[in-house]
Amino acid sequence: MKVSASVKKICRNCKVIRRKGVVRVICTDPRHKQRQG
């Protein structure tokens, strides 16, 4: 899980979603998991 100020899609499987006001990236590759904050 990377915590960064700006979350970006890394590959085509990445999806940017909003969960409880937190922007997250979910992906089939666990290394691509990110959250904003």
From Swiss-Prot:
Gene Ontology biological process: translation
Any one Gene Ontology cellular component term annotated for this protein: ribonucleoprotein complex
InterPro entries hit by this protein: Ribosomal_bL36, Ribosomal_bL36_sp
Molecular function (Gene Ontology), one example: structural constituent of ribosome
A Pfam entry, by short name: Ribosomal_L36
Keywords tagged on the record: Ribonucleoprotein, Ribosomal protein
Keyword Glycoprotein in record: no
NCBIfam families assigned: rpmJ_bact
Family: Belongs to the bacterial ribosomal protein bL36 family.
UniProt-recorded name of the protein: Large ribosomal subunit protein bL36
Organism: Albidiferax ferrireducens (strain ATCC BAA-621 / DSM 15236 / T118) (Rhodoferax ferrireducens)
